[in-house]
């Protein structure tokens, strides 16, 4: 079978943005993200500073037998704004007889976050570089991207800092499942909760792929009043999404969700956390930019939380709180 290979180079900031845009296109068979190989490096290893600094190359494939010129033009037009704003190169199009196997990929996708986490695709060959590394194997999807969204990265940095073995944790808005996997591999027990059926399936797949099914329970549903907010991203939910009651049962809640949901659930977060002699009741929030920072922090402070830590990446921000 022959394929139309469409590719572009993009920045760290825009890699998951590209995936989100491509989710609108039917019939995309496969998405591959690799580390960018810079053709502008001289033999001495110096970069041509006049060239933009790309981080990743994204390749995706359409069956050549059913691919039309109109479909390719639609994809090119969809991605054009990223090219015009300097976030991606112009779309490149070629015909290939076979897609490359994992062993044939140049610069396979390997990305480090914090001191220990290493994000990999399911098939990327990898040998640990240091003791204590924690591999997180994540399938790149158009629904949830690569796991490199700034909010995800900030969450992982705080998770690495605060999660310890034997904690009982709620991952609210689990999405791809990457945060649940990370916490399970740090020794925690996790309830992964999302009100989107696609997210629930993606989380379950990631849990099995990373062999943490004994530590992670995946459910469709929401916490407390979150079940009354509808689909947080505006999509469809099943009727009567199960509700997890906000009673003192979690040592930590991690929520990488929209600002308005953080605000709506502030009191439920407080009720769902428990304080013990060894655990103060922790909340990690992410998924919003500095535009909403003050409103989220104010709502959580009023609900009885104390800010203890913060991580920032460009306009994105994540906070750690404890029960005051």
Language-model segments: what does each one mean?
Residues 1-66:
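Non-catalytic accessory regions of SAM-dependent methyltransferases
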Residues 3-5, 55-57, 116, 313-320:
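Short hydrophobic/aromatic beta-strand or adjacent loop that forms the aromatic wall/cage
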Residues 18-25, 70-82:
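Short amphipathic alpha-helices in soluble, non-transmembrane regions
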Residues 30, 90-92, 118, 168, ...:
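Conserved beta-strand segments of alpha/beta enzyme cores
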Residues 73-145:
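Non-catalytic substrate-recognition/targeting regions of SAM-dependent transferases
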Residues 142, 146-224:
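Conserved SAM/SAH cofactor-binding pocket of Class I
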Residues 195-324:
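S-adenosylmethionine
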